[in-house]
Regions:
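AAA+ ATPase active-site-proximal loops
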Residues: 133-146
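Acidic, metal-coordinating helix/loop segments flanking the phosphotransfer/catalytic sites
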Residues: 30-49, 57-58
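The C-terminal output helix
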Residues: 117-131
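Short amphipathic alpha-helix used as the core "switch/output" element in two-component signaling
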Residues: 60-76
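C-terminal output helix
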Residues: 87, 107-116
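Two-component/phosphorelay signaling modules centered on CheY-like receiver
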Residues: 11-30, 35
């Protein structure tokens, strides 16, 4: 089962997203602040997708900080950023920080699900390609020994 972490300072948004995605068969957890995210991350981080709001009120760090941290620490993770104060600069900044995609709040359920599914498929394809590359590289090394 695909595990998703939602990070947003608005509890109702977290609950709504959790309900929507749970109905789609995803296992969803949420955090309302950087501190809650940090606590979850330190315990056992085994998520496939992280949805992160760019602007977290009353937090020591913002969504961009979380994106950069996650991208540097976890190679095979889908990160989707979102914001209710969206503009093209926010989208570009979040992708430069390491997000796979960006969605503007409020968003339609279908669009959110599509973005998650699309990015999970792309991740699966990248992992498969990398596995094949590693196998080819390994066999090439064996062929050249001696």
């Amino acid at each position: 089962m695909t595990k998703i972490l939602v990070i947003d300072d608005e509890l109702e948004i977290c609950k709504q997203i959790s309900l929507i995605l749970s109905k789609q068969g995803y296992e969803v957890t949420y955090a309302n602040s950087y501190k809650e995210f940090s606590d979850l991350e330190q315990r056992n981080f085994d998520y496939d997708v992280v949805l992160v709001d760019l602007w977290l009120k009353n937090s020591t760090k913002q969504g961009i900080d979380i994106i950069e941290y996650l991208k540097n620490k976890y190679e095979n993770l889908v990160i989707v950023s979102f914001s209710g104060h969206a503009n093209i600069d926010n989208a570009i900044e979040s992708v430069k920080a390491g997000a796979n995609d960006f969605i503007e709040k409020p968003f339609e359920t279908k669009k959110l699900i599509h973005i998650i599914q699309k990015n999970l498929l792309e991740l699966k394809q990248r992992v498969t390609i990398n596995n094949y590359r590693n196998k080819i590289s390994f066999h090439s090394k064996i062929d050249t020994i001696g």
